[in-house]
């Protein structure tokens, strides 16, 4: 979808939503050979997802559920309502099969602007209006809530987008190096304590 200054971008027209993987405690494995599952603790608002405390399961997600570089990972349900709606983006770290758990979702778009929209005040206000539950119940939002969000695109957005992307590229380079270091560390520890 082409975006122009002064237009309105609706997330449902710019991308799609993919539900997370449902699994049970019996599907969880100790090895890092299965599918890596990201949960709300792996989401930090506006930053790339973190790879700490991943859950590994012996279930195979469908093709659409496998995370791709640039996907937005969203907390869709949580006992703490302030965590619902928080979003990070996925940076491919070479994990063969990574997905999100059932209480999270994936927003996928080819439009580079959408990543930044999930960090906006407008997005956060919309999520606060949509949250269901809370007060002891699990608070949640629905895929339709995400896809219904519309953003007014200001004039000159291209210049700001270029600056944001340039800063982000530098940040991601450092993150990818860190991911590689962590992968080597994990491999060495696995070999050492067989």
Q: Which residues does each PLM region occupy?
A:
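Non-catalytic DNA-recognition/assembly elements of restriction-modification systems
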Residues: 1-22, 148, 153-159, 172-191
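Sequence-specific dsDNA recognition surfaces
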Residues: 12-27, 41-72, 94
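Glycine- and charge-enriched low-complexity intrinsically disordered segments
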Residues: 112-132
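Extracytoplasmic mature domains of secreted or surface-exposed proteins
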Residues: 166-170
């Amino acid at each position: 979808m082409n975006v122009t200054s002064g237009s309105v971008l609706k997330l449902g027209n710019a991308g799609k939503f993919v539900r997370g993987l449902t699994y049970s405690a019996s599907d969880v494995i100790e090895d890092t050979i299965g599918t890596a599952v990201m949960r709300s603790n792996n989401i930090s608002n506006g930053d790339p997802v973190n790879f700490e405390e991943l859950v590994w399961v012996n279930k195979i997600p469908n093709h659409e559920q496998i995370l791709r570089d640039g996907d937005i990972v969203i907390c869709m349900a949580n006992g703490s309502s302030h965590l619902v709606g928080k979003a990070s983006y996925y940076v491919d770290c070479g994990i063969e099969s990574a997905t999100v758990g059932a209480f999270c979702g994936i927003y996928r778009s080819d439009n580079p602007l959408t990543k930044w929209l999930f960090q906006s005040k407008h997005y956060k206000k919309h999520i606060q209006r949509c949250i269901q539950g809370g007060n002891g119940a699990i608070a949640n939002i629905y895929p339709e809530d995400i896809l219904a969000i519309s953003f007014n695109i200001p004039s000159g957005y291209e210049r700001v987008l270029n600056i944001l992307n340039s800063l982000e590229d530098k940040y991601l380079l450092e993150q990818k190096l860190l991911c590689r270091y962590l992968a080597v560390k994990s491999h060495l520890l696995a070999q050492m304590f067989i």
